[in-house]
């Protein structure tokens, strides 16, 4: 019996129990019963049928690698989605009890009212009015089939409501204008009637100046106060000249009292002189007479040994008398005035 070299992926032709260890070659690999069959795509030059038959030969009836369950037996595993959705769904599947629906019918929706299947005339009390104007096939001609003239007369509405029948081919009718071809419409209503043709040459020369906006003063002759909603001066004067009783007032407004205390004070004329008392005191000045009264005070107590004039010493019993000015002496104010004018003031001393 010849032996062929085998790869690790190739199955063995002989079992280790039946082969002789002494006769095996050193380069051969001993296979066991747990060796997996070689896949069909990894064997070059072999067909799928030969591989399947070879697998059946290697795996016996008692091999642990053989599948003992049928193809329909899935065991404890659940069916996949592709196996469930193979069948087509019908109307009966909508009524299957699948438990509580998630987030379904959480809010209550009120049916809209009124429902179109109800009698609206009976619901709103319009049955009598509908019976009056309903068209019933009783062989009689309804007077209101073309116009509501009789009903309008019954209501007492003033005016004429006679319908005027017009010709269907009248070019002034809206239906004729809508069905007019585009070429005919342009020839009759567009061409030669552009809006720019309605403006004269004089108007075209002024329109650019009229629509140009720029800053500037408006002449008084062209100014109109009514544009801004202001009260004109003439109407304001007429309003002021009216007596208070003739002026319109708001409701619940108390009337003005026409007593002497409420009379309006008229503005004084420029030549009018008021008899109010005026101030006679002159303003402060710096002339020769502005220093009067500065030297008419008490003398200083610096040279006295009896104390101050506030009550200490022998002079505490009374106030000092004002010292009378002697003819041969000169007052302090005059001496100060003469000494403040330079050498011209002291030249006479």
Swiss-Prot record:
Compartment list: Nucleus
GO process terms (BP): regulation of transcription by RNA polymerase II
Source organism superkingdom: Eukaryota
Keywords: Activator, Nucleus, Transcription, Transcription regulation
Basic and acidic residues composition bias: residue spans: 70-81
MF terms in GO: transcription coregulator activity
Pfam families: Rox3
Region of interest (Disordered), residue spans: 1-81, 238-349
Biased composition (Low complexity): 1-28, 330-341
Polar residues: compositionally biased ranges: 29-53
GO CC terms: mediator complex
Main location as per UniProt: nucleus
Family: Belongs to the Mediator complex subunit 19 family.
Assembly: Component of the Mediator complex.
Role this protein plays: Component of the Mediator complex, a coactivator involved in the regulated transcription of nearly all RNA polymerase II-dependent genes. Mediator functions as a bridge to convey information from gene-specific regulatory proteins to the basal RNA polymerase II transcription machinery. Mediator is recruited to promoters by direct interactions with regulatory proteins and serves as a scaffold for the assembly of a functional preinitiation complex with RNA polymerase II and the general transcription factors.
Name the UniProt record assigns to this protein: Mediator of RNA polymerase II transcription subunit 19
Organism: Neurospora crassa (strain ATCC 24698 / 74-OR23-1A / CBS 708.71 / DSM 1257 / FGSC 987)
Lineage: Eukaryota, Fungi, Dikarya, Ascomycota, Pezizomycotina
Gene name of the record: rox3
